[in-house]
Every structure is written in C-alpha cells, then in structure tokens.
Amino acid sequence: MELEVYWVWLNELRGLPLKAKRKLLENLSNPRDIFHASLDTITYILATGSPHATSVAEGSKEPAYTSVWTARSLEVAESILTNHNKHNIHLLSPHDEHYRHMYAADKKTPLVLYYRGRLSDPDIPVVGVIGSRSCTSYGELVAKAAVKDLVGQGNIIASGLSFGIDAIAHKTTLKCQGVTYAFVPCGLHKAQPASHTALMEKITDTGAVITPYAFGKEALPFRFIGRNNVLASWCDTVLVIEARTKSGSMNTARSALKKGKHVLAIPNSLLTPSSSGTNQLLAEGAQAYLNDRLLLCESADSNPVLGFSSQQSEQAIIKALRTGALTTSEIDTFVQDRDLSVMEYLSNMELADKIMFRSDGRWHLVGGL
C-alpha cells in the first residue's frame, strides 16, 4: 500500500515521457526510489547510452526536466488515492499478477491501471467483443450468439461500455452469468456514457471496470485511443462484430493486430456501411468469423458436412427466400434441425454464395438459385 502513492505520482508526472519512466524503473527498484533519487542520478540513468552521456552526467548541459524534478510532490497522487479509497477503486502496477505480463509485453501500456470490482484468475482467457455504436439487427444477433458461446466456453468477455455492440456484449455476458470487463476512457468517478451507470455497477458485482485514467479525468478524444490500446493489450482475442472504416473499433482491432493478438471479423455485404471496416480488417490479416463454433480455433475449411435434416433445412430456407427477402427471425421458423443454430445455417450459406445479407436488414437469395 505504501508504494501506491509513488506509483500514482510517477504515472501522473508530467514532463517525463513514458519511455523515460520505464527506463528509470528498469534501473531503480521501485517508484519510491525514483522519487527520492537525486537529479544527478536521474540524469545519468536517462542519458546512459546516448552520445552525450558523459557531458550530461557532469552537468555541462541542463536536462529539460530539471524544473519538473525539483518541483516534484506527492500532493496530486495523495489526492487521487484519497478519492480512490472513498470509491473502492484499486490500482494495478507492473508488480501485480494481473498486469505484469501485459506491462512487459507492450512498451506503450501505462505504468498503472485503475479498476473497480473484482478481477478473475489471470490465466482465464479474455475475449474482446467490440463493434459499432449503431449496430444493425444482424450485428446484434451475431454478438449475442457469439458472447453466449464464448461465456459457455469459460471466457471472460471484455468491451468498452459504449452503446451498441459494447452494451450488448456486457449485458449478454451478465445474462449468461459470465464475467465481463469494461474498459473506459475516463476516471472511475463516472460511467461513460452516463446512461450506462447502472450497467457499470452491475458489471462490478462479478467483473471489473478498468481504466488507465485516474479519478476525475474526463473522457477527452485522445483518451478513447488510450483506452482502446489497453483493451487490445488485455485481450487474448478480439472479435469485431460490425465497424465502419473510421471508428474506434477499427482503432482497437488494428492495435490488437500490431500486438500479435488473435483478431476475428465478421464478413458481410460490401453494400453494408456498418461492415466496411470489418471487411477491411479481413484484408489486413484478421481471421473471418464464421460461426460461434469456429470462433477461436477452427478455420474456414472445417465447416461440418451437412446431414440429411440439415440439407432439408437449407432447402426450406432457399424455398422461402424465393418468395422474397426475410429477416433472420423470419427464417428461423424454417429451420428444422436444431443441432445447428439459424446463424450457423445462414453463415454457411452466405460463405457458399447462396444468400447474402443486405443493408435492408434482410437475407436475399444470390441470383440463379
């Protein structure tokens, strides 16, 4: 507990970039030792390896951060911790089992994270389910099916507490009695958006709300990017349900790809604006999401061979679509074989170019059938 105030101080310290803070931590045992170190010690550590190491260390050139160091104080950090203690907000440092591997693997992650609620065993896989704030009925259906399956497999579901797919992911997880983590772009003094305050509180009953920002920090645009980076780093797998080309979900997905994470995207019609980003992700190296049974470990080549009853169901769907386009719920009444879900039929048939989902929210036959 004594070290927490020093972790917060170093994390919030302005005038010293993250790279420099990490270098100090590599050379000194903890942030308390950094706080009490002399300017000469700090200067020498940060100058080591540079062409000017000797002259800087000898003081022939005043470091740019001299004023920052001479004016250092724990006052701001103590105020933050006081508020955190009042609101049951906890701190994660690189020494914590939930954060040490993530911190070591990604040089751009912050020194500390803050959270409310409870964190599960760090060995349990975490799957991020993200997507458009203005999702389609198709996206909602796929998100619910995927989350239900993932929770059943024992995964923790992570998302961003926003409208649309994020909220669906959190709510579906809770409905399935699973654990969900919400990553937010502000301090934990409020929910973002405010209308999700009740959802935020519900999440903390069994899961956690996590942020890289201290109490009182508001959700400014650049903080959404920081939140997305932490979400991408925390997750083992990221599933993008629907996303436009320029969106926060695309930012998160691309961040995850750069970190070498397993990224999946739902293929959809090129005529559907809400899926322009997910289709682009497939071109950038994401794996195609086919159905909930193939989500984590199967490939497109492993589609099951349809049995007789399954073939009958497909034929019934095709026959129904010949009379006109139908919604997913309307098609569900034609599925006889309940070993497979309606979305599995539709996904397989879409991949076989038998049907397509269009922007009107309905399934259409591909010409010639």
Feature-to-residue mapping (PLM):
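Glycine-biased, small-residue-rich flexible motifs in mid-sequence functional cores and linkers
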Residues: 1-4, 93-369
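Short, small/acidic-rich helices and loops at N termini and domain boundaries
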Residues: 1-98, 352-369
